[in-house]
From Swiss-Prot:
Bilayer-spanning residue ranges: none
Source organism per UniProt: Escherichia phage T7
Domain text: The acidic C-terminus is involved in modulating the ssDNA binding properties. It is also required for dimer formation and for interactions with the viral DNA polymerase and the helicase.
Gene Ontology process terms (BP): DNA recombination; DNA repair; DNA replication; viral DNA genome replication
Annotated Acidic residues bias: 214-232
Function per UniProt: Single-stranded DNA-binding protein that participates in viral DNA replication, formation of concatemers, recombination and repair of double-stranded breaks. Coats the lagging-strand ssDNA as the replication fork advances and stimulates the activities of viral DNA polymerase and primase/helicase. Coordinates simultaneous synthesis of leading- and lagging-strands. Together with DNA primase/helicase, promotes pairing of two homologous DNA molecules containing complementary single-stranded regions and mediates homologous DNA strand exchange. Also promotes the formation of joint molecules.
Swiss-Prot/TrEMBL keywords: DNA damage, DNA repair, DNA replication, DNA-binding, Viral DNA replication
Protein name stated in the entry: Single-stranded DNA-binding protein
Assembly with partners or alone: Homodimer. Interacts (via C-terminus) with the viral DNA polymerase. Interacts with the viral helicase/primase. Part of the replicase complex that includes the DNA polymerase, host thioredoxin, the primase/helicase and the single-stranded DNA binding protein.
HAMAP family: SSB_T7
Family: Belongs to the Teseptimavirus single-stranded DNA-binding protein family.
Domain of life: Viruses
Ranges for region Disordered: 189-232
Length: 232
């Protein structure tokens, strides 16, 4: 079955976005993620009509999927080991929240790799990033908080488990970079502390280069690609 792809409104990336490269966590501190995760929290003005439609689409997807899951649970209750309590259906947090300041933040993510079911080989996923003209970028810059973005995404409902309640994952499919805000590295904070005859960095970060054109229109579209990433 084809997967429906949605396009977000223009929004502002929050800090700690992982778009150019995935986040692998910190294994030494006990929260490593060997599969890697691309992710971005995108804040959109509530006055943008698309913002409310995004909320409505997510809520509808969740309500329909949750109702079906509860019906299935009641019709076929899972077997429970003696002395154990059954895990009853419950709902989790939605992947968005109203900030109370006229904006809503949506949380998008996807895995950066998957295991081939036949070969058991790990396949890496390169997140597609396009420029404001819809051209795929070969060298994706580090995209910092404050960057203006649009994203393409799919809705992936998931059931409750012992860790989280039933909700919807906003599966990140691709990103349009409209306005870039990079990490300044705190250079302005050092303006008054210049040391003469010291080390001077040579060159600057590479500009992003367009590679090939990809359709990135405003309308929702259908994608036939299989969802290899799975749920969180």
């Amino acid at each position: 079955m084809a997967k429906k792809i949605f396009t977000s409104a223009l929004g502002t990336a929050e800090p700690y976005a992982y778009i150019a490269k995935p986040d692998y966590g910190n294994e030494e501190r006990g929260f490593g993620n060997p599969r890697g995760v691309y992710k971005v929290d995108l804040t959109i003005p509530n006055k943008d009509p698309r913002c409310q439609r995004m909320v409505d689409e997510i809520v509808k997807c969740h309500e329909e999927a949750y109702a079906a899951a509860v019906e299935e649970y009641e019709a076929n209750p899972p077997a429970v080991a003696r002395g154990k309590k059954p895990l009853k259906p419950y709902e989790g947090d939605m992947p968005f929240f109203d900030n109370g300041d006229g904006t809503t933040t949506f949380k998008f993510k996807c895995y950066a790799s998957f295991q081939d079911k036949k070969t058991k080989e790990t396949k890496h996923i390169n997140l597609v990033v396009v420029d404001s003209k819809g051209k795929k970028m070969e060298d994706v810059p580090i995209i910092g908080g404050g960057s203006k973005l649009k994203v393409k995404y799919s809705l992936v409902p998931y059931k409750w488990n012992t860790a989280v309640g039933a909700s919807v994952k906003l599966q990140l499919e691709s990103v349009m970079l409209v306005e870039l805000a990079t990490f300044g590295g705190g250079e302005d904070d050092w303006a008054d502390e210049v040391e003469e005859n010291g080390y001077v960095a040579s060159g600057s970060a590479k500009a992003s280069k367009p590679r090939d054109e990809e359709s990135w229109d405003e309308d929702d579209e259908e994608s036939e690609e299989a969802d290899e990433d799975g749920d969180f």
